[in-house]
Amino acid sequence: MNTAIEFKNIKKVYGNKVVLERFNFSVAKGEFVTIIGSSGCGKTTVLKMINGLIEPTSDDIFVDGSNILDKNLTELRPNIGYAIQGSVLFPHMTVEQNISYVQNLINKKNKEKTKLAVSKWMKLVGLDEELKERYPAELSGGQQQRVGIARALAASPEILLMDEPFGAVDEITRGQLQIELKQIHKKTGITVLFVTHDISEALKLGTKVLVMGKGQVQQYAKPDDLLRNPNTDFVKQLVDKERRTCYLPDERLEDCEYSGAGNK
């Protein structure tokens, strides 16, 4: 396996609270891993560690074979995109300026390259070109979320971290964003880690699903394997909940087509 990310026996403590303990898992390059678990189980902590925002209390995390503790943030961050719920955009910047912010840091002297990159990512996330000069306050929730995703992708990172990025939008927009994200993953081959509270979303999007609980990995498997063979009571509860709803296999998402996403 060509490994993109590896956690080795990680422990993380906040004050007197142990959030992660004996936490082990690895992600292959190009994998789309959805992460699910109860509130406070350490899902966001995992993403923040990969991005260098916080450090483990003990042991090591490897990104592309290198221990992140041996890297400074300027080395680590260009390879990692980060999108969160609500997509915190710069209110005084236009859509184009928001998306190009990271590109401008990398390509300070190549404005034409930056403009081409902005157009490329706007198109890929379903944003109309005419929105370039608008400010965040003039956009719908779905459009703002797309800008946030485009900004996270603008530097062409190898890894995309997403922390409940669709939590603040309506169900129709959420479904459209799910389809777009699957298409982006398919086109770019980027490694994605996607945190969600929704088991249905985790099963639809992920090529693999990481179930967290009590600071440890409860199960790490392909969606179909998770449904067929839940191995703990916690995972069984999640699976039973999903069986009471309608499970949409991720193949359906890849084949779906729709239009007008950039206008919603």
State what each model feature region is:
Residues 51:
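Helix-to-loop junction immediately C-terminal to a conserved catalytic motif
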Residues 67-81, 105, 111, 229-230:
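ABC ATPase NBD coupling module
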Residues 95-105, 112-115, 119:
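Short helical segment in ABC ATPase nucleotide-binding domains corresponding to the A-loop/adjacent helical element
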Residues 112-130, 183:
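Conserved ABC ATPase "signature" region
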Residues 154-158:
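A short, proline-enriched helix->beta-strand linker immediately N-terminal to the Walker B motif
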Residues 214-215:
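Conserved ABC ATPase "signature" C-loop
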Residues 220-221, 229:
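ABC ATPase "signature
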